[in-house]
Amino acid sequence: MSPSTTSKMSLEKMWEEVTCSICLDPMVEPMSIECGHCFCKECIFEVGKNGGSSCPECRQQFLLRNLRPNRHIANMVENLKQIAQNTKKSTQETHCMKHGEKLHLFCEEDGQALCWVCAQSGKHRDHTRVPIEEAAKVYQEKIHVVLEKLRKGKELAEKMEMDLTMQRTDWKRNIDTQKSRIHAEFALQNSLLAQEEQRQLQRLEKDQREYLRLLGKKEAELAEKNQALQELISELERRIRGSELELLQEVRIILERSGSWNLDTLDIDAPDLTSTCPVPGRKKMLRTCWVHITLDRNTANSWLIISKDRRQVRMGDTHQNVSDNKERFSNYPMVLGAQRFSSGKMYWEVDVTQKEAWDLGVCRDSVQRKGQFSLSPENGFWTIWLWQDSYEAGTSPQTTLHIQVPPCQIGIFVDYEAGVVSFYNITDHGSLIYTFSECVFAGPLRPFFNVGFNYSGGNAAPLKLCPLKM
């Protein structure tokens, strides 16, 4: 067997080793799996894209995250392609296209292979010329260095690509888990709300049945007494119409019966229908709209003292040394929040502990600051207040509020687009105090605070903006 035949058979064997058993083509970006078999990157990713799968060669299980680039096979493919290309071009590449002479020198300055005729020409005569073999060796070493750097970069890029693929998979799994958790939490919350609704309705039905039973009992008693009364009236009328002897017969007994008769009052306690209806999770849901409020010193009445963090305000004993600007309230101990709202949902809480008087709510940014005015929606105020032990809403006319548990903290919720301002008694499980609906805001809103006058000395406590508590 001739050397050329042996070389040909060796090349065929090498081509078989670098052929992908999936696509039957030379491997592109060869990747090794746990069992040691190697395949095209795209082919093996297609096999294992749905999770764990088995090797097409030996059926052993493998995972995509354990794939590793096979540089040995990649180099073999590149070398075999280069051999095939060199075999085809060897004749053309070894001789000068211009002179037909063998190329045996290399011009360093021009980076060009030369024959002996080219080397003697004026263009290359004064340039550095080295033998082809020597130049090839030098540049081969340089290319090897560059190749090694590029291969390491490619390996890093492939690893990063695989890491990103795994991150994408992990992220999607985490998102799906979080979605399931959110669905479960809201399903539970809806279930609790439905149960509480049923409990409240059942309690109301029970109160209704008991009240109607008592009314029925009283009606029966009243009918019985009415019948007895009618009989007594008829007896007395008969005696009056009769003879004197008949009139006097047992007259003392009849009069005693008539004098002792009385009609009981309808003393029935009606169910309390003004009591609050607790809604589970209301405070937590409201606090998802929480905004951090601070006080605007430029709007504060000159009697007010505002804390350093601008989260508390109280009535002072003397005027503060402040400028009388157009934003400042002049007649009442009022101050606005620094924040302005023209859209969205907002919620904050105010501590009114130990306060005997206060006003809270929101107002238009453009409200009157000087002189006397009333707090009403017509004047751009949506507020509730405590004054002389009475809670009221600033409607026209004012609305008396029946609050079962005196609040220590008030929650204020604004839905700008819906035109709603609601107040909640945080002390009483977040029960609703009052809601202004269908409000026409017509411009930016600001939080509103009135600490109330301290005539008796019992209203010195500050209004405090509460920190967020989830």
Curated annotation (Swiss-Prot):
**Superkingdom, natural source:** Eukaryota
Q: Name one GO biological process term.
A: protein autoubiquitination
Does the UniProt entry include the keyword Metal-binding? yes
Q: Kindly give the SUPFAM superfamilies that the UniProt entry links to this protein.
A: B-box zinc-binding domain (SSF57845), Concanavalin A-like lectins/glucanases (SSF49899), RING/U-box (SSF57850)
Q: Which InterPro entries match?
A: B30.2/SPRY, B30.2/SPRY_sf, Butyrophylin_SPRY, ConA-like_dom_sf, PRY, PRY/SPRY_TRIM21, SPRY_dom, TRIM/RBCC
Cellular component GO terms held in the UniProt record: autophagosome; cytoplasm; cytoplasmic stress granule; cytoplasmic vesicle; nucleus; P-body; ribonucleoprotein complex
PROSITE patterns, alphabetically?
A: B302_SPRY (PS50188), ZF_BBOX (PS50119), ZF_RING_1 (PS00518), ZF_RING_2 (PS50089)
Give the function comment from the record. Answer: E3 ubiquitin-protein ligase whose activity is dependent on E2 enzymes, UBE2D1, UBE2D2, UBE2E1 and UBE2E2. Forms a ubiquitin ligase complex in cooperation with the E2 UBE2D2 that is used not only for the ubiquitination of USP4 and IKBKB but also for its self-ubiquitination. Component of cullin-RING-based SCF (SKP1-CUL1-F-box protein) E3 ubiquitin-protein ligase complexes such as SCF(SKP2)-like complexes. A TRIM21-containing SCF(SKP2)-like complex is shown to mediate ubiquitination of CDKN1B ('Thr-187' phosphorylated-form), thereby promoting its degradation by the proteasome.
| Name the record gives this protein | E3 ubiquitin-protein ligase TRIM21
